[in-house]
């Protein structure tokens, strides 16, 4: 377990907007009556940078962000199980470049949808409870990791439908896993966090032969020699409550709990003592009225800024390149009153989407001077 080092005071950002950038509401869509839990732009394929996907109820919907604030629906998938409630969705990719969408939720089954053929490519079965988050390996987008209520994280090959590795056990999470994220440049490493208040860093390096084997496996996926990984390389207790979102920022980590703020901190791993090390909280990004769980933030592709919604339907956009932290702007509209469950920033941050508890999607676009 890492220790939080004292003596280094973290720097808190000011809630006075700098208005470095200004945004205006350009669209609002009422998708349905059910809560929308996820909205994600495609960062994997430059052909589809303007395409985003939403998840809510038993439905997954793809949209295109057009110029002048317009949004067009491209396709919609309704799960055969009407009791399904999707909590998370991620873009992935077939080995031939086909765009896939992977979605999971209360039923614990991950549906991998082939966008080109509009069919289910694979259904990934293995989790014993609901799936709270899916993230794709950007360097190898056939690989996804899933965080589950069953206290495990699983690594899958969406092309072959194989569960490669299961991260759980003696050193694993002790309650629901709420968020996962692959390291942006170290292909072997990812972070997970959850209701047990911890953030864990895991390494797949010594199990990479299993990953390679998953691409050439021709037998039944259920016969694949799935490996259990019981111990992370690092565990941190940065927060004192549920940790529901974590994202890598280079070798640093952005994470949030239910304490009205996002933290930027540095995990300092001890190479000779796996699981141990220290943690320095460097910067704090305040987010008022954000003390309930399952509110997730997002960044643009180049990690220049972060956008997060709150319980009142407002979005706070922080500059990640400034120290002390600078609030770029606060986005609000008199009709946006519902909890914002997730935001999505476009590749360059010029468009910000928010999906809400009341089934609405809001679009803000930067005002060009």
From Swiss-Prot:
Database matches in InterPro entries: G-protein_beta_WD-40_rep, PcG_WD-repeat, WD40/YVTN_repeat-like_dom_sf, WD40_repeat_CS, WD40_repeat_dom_sf, WD40_rpt
Molecular function per GO: DNA-binding transcription factor activity
Cellular localisation: Nucleus
Record's keyword terms, sorted: Chromatin regulator, Developmental protein, Nucleus, Repeat, Repressor, Transcription, Transcription regulation, WD repeat
GO cellular component assignments: chromatin silencing complex; polar nucleus
Listed SUPFAM superfamilies: WD40 repeat-like
The keyword Thylakoid is assigned to this record: no
Biological processes annotated in GO: chromatin organization; negative regulation of flower development; regulation of endosperm development; response to cold; vernalization response
WD repeat copies, ranges: 31-73, 81-123, 126-166, 172-212, 238-275, 287-328, 335-368
Pfam family, one: WD40
Reported tissue expression: Expressed in cauline leaves, root and stems. In the male reproductive organ, it is expressed in the developing anther; and is abundant in microspore mother cells, in microsporocytes and in the tapetum, but is absent from vascular bundles, the connective tissue and the filament. It is also absent from pollen grains at subsequent developmental stages. In the developing female reproductive organs, it is highly expressed in all cells of the young ovules primordium before archesporial differentiation.
Function (record text): Polycomb group (PcG) protein. PcG proteins act by forming multiprotein complexes, which are required to maintain the transcriptionally repressive state of homeotic genes throughout development. PcG proteins are not required to initiate repression, but to maintain it during later stages of development. They probably act via the methylation of histones, rendering chromatin heritably changed in its expressibility. Required to prevent the proliferation of the central cell by repressing unknown target genes before fertilization.
Subunit structure: Interacts directly with MEA. These two proteins are probably indirectly associated with FIS2. In plants, PcG complexes are probably composed of a member of the EZ family (CLF or MEA), FIE, and a member of the VEFS family (FIS2, VRN2 or EMF2). Component of the plant homeodomain / polycomb repressive complex 2 (PHD-PRC2) large complex during prolonged cold, composed of core PRC2 components (VRN2, EZA1, FIE and MSI1), and three related PHD finger proteins (VIL1, VIL2 and VIN3) that mediates histone H3 trimethylation on 'Lys-27' (H3K27me3). Binds to ALP1.
UniProt-recorded name of the protein: Polycomb group protein FERTILIZATION-INDEPENDENT ENDOSPERM
